[in-house]
């Protein structure tokens, strides 16, 4: 019983060690010099969930400046009916 618990503890330690490596996310708008525009709903859809919520920057990897601009442009696209406020389930 104790040997089995020891193995589980070791496996947990291995999982924690493997998690430390991650790739730094780079802001797509800074790297490629892309302008954010509300008239391009296909480009904006990449930054909203399937439920219609705006994805946070820790997931998308955008910088703070472009995340603010992105939120404004998504809201603008919703106002002129290029993007839905809520997606159907």
Curated annotation (Swiss-Prot):
Source organism, top-level taxon: Bacteria
Record keywords, A-Z: Ribonucleoprotein, Ribosomal protein, RNA-binding, rRNA-binding
GO cellular component entries: cytosolic small ribosomal subunit
GO biological process: translation
Any one Gene Ontology molecular-function term assigned to this protein's record: small ribosomal subunit rRNA binding
InterPro entries listed in its UniProt record: Ribosomal_bS18, Ribosomal_bS18_CS, Ribosomal_bS18_sf
PANTHER family: 30S RIBOSOMAL PROTEIN S18 (PTHR13479), SMALL RIBOSOMAL SUBUNIT PROTEIN BS18M (PTHR13479:SF40)
NCBIfam families found in the cross-reference section: S18
Protein family membership: Belongs to the bacterial ribosomal protein bS18 family.
Subunit structure: Part of the 30S ribosomal subunit. Forms a tight heterodimer with protein bS6.
Chain's role: Binds as a heterodimer with protein bS6 to the central domain of the 16S rRNA, where it helps stabilize the platform of the 30S subunit.
Official protein name in the record: Small ribosomal subunit protein bS18
